[in-house]
């Protein structure tokens, strides 16, 4: 697998409202652990849309790993121009910091937000252009990642497209391992 799309919950879906929330350490650690396994198997790129939450945290985790894995690249392909336009300032700063370090950055539709169709097009593009999907998602705690997951499941039915999860149980294990 060369290209891995990553998505997951937005911060509010996880009850995270501050960028210094202790939970972020464990979320990023769980993401890093999964990325390292993929890197050892030949992963070259992670693909995110720059969405707040898991996607930006995954990019930050990837940037941390680039010291040890300098060939790992991050692509940020937004569904439309200025997706951060109405975000709060700390969120904009985090987003801009992620974009500044990205190896590739583009906007899929080359227009500002017009309709939910742009998100659907983004999901399809990500699944079409990647070799697998990693989600921080628990099907028992439904949230925004369900749309990308649905697109991935349709492709999996056609060609076996791999879908990987980081679940709430995985996060608990990460916390427990760190406690020893």
From Swiss-Prot:
Q: Which SUPFAM superfamilies match?
A: MCP/YpsA-like (SSF102405)
Q: Which domain of life is it from?
A: Bacteria
* InterPro entries the record matches: YspA
Entry-linked Pfam families = YpsA
Which NCBIfam families does this entry report, sorted A to Z? PRK13660.1
The family assignment reads: Belongs to the UPF0398 family.
PANTHER family reported for this sequence: UPF0398 PROTEIN SPR0331, UPF0398 PROTEIN YPSA
The protein's name in its UniProt record: UPF0398 protein YpsA
The organism named in the record is Bacillus subtilis (strain 168)
